[in-house]
Amino acid sequence: MKRFLFIGILFVLCLTSFQAHAQRYLPGMKGLQVTAGMADGVHWNSDTDFAYHIGAAYSVYTKNANRWVIGGEYLHKKYDYKDMQIPVEQFTAEGGYYLKFLSDRRKTFFLSLGLSALAGYETSNQSEKLLPDGSTLLDKDCFIYGGALTLELEAYLTDRIALLANARERALFSSDIGKFHTQVSLGLKFIIN
């Protein structure tokens, strides 16, 4: 009896102490991610200059656990004007490179720093330049370009699903409205291969 108990305990110890961990951040891995968050501060009600953004991206992992990212993003912000709010929308495409600089031993958490190029289109008040009070908007709809610096945390929930938290600063130099936008967002990444 003691012999079977000893073998059983030894078997359980072998199973728990030498666990194999999932392979993550391997060259050639691909992922799809969706993110949503707030821009230019945290405003919970729509009576202030409320701003939000949503985005989707495709990632391809390279050597040294870095990755290329391409994607698109929509940013919506309202600016106060007298007793109304004027909406501004930006539609941008992104292409960038993210460098992993920190991870834990179990490969569950990854911290990356990314640099991206952005290009897109900006529209004010849905292209309506005449306001209800008779004023005319001088801001024109225009093509925008610039870049973004991103700090991103990936926390793997399963082998194929990761929770994302990121903070980024967008600089769009050709924008008529605002050159810089700070964004904070949460999202999910799905590994597809």
Model feature map: region roles:
Residues 1-7:
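Bacterial N-terminal signal peptides that target proteins for export
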Residues 20-70, 189-193:
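Short glycine/proline- and aromatic-enriched beta-strand/turn motifs that initiate or cap beta-hairpins
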Residues 75-78, 147-193:
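Predominantly the C-terminal beta-signal and adjacent terminal strand-loop region
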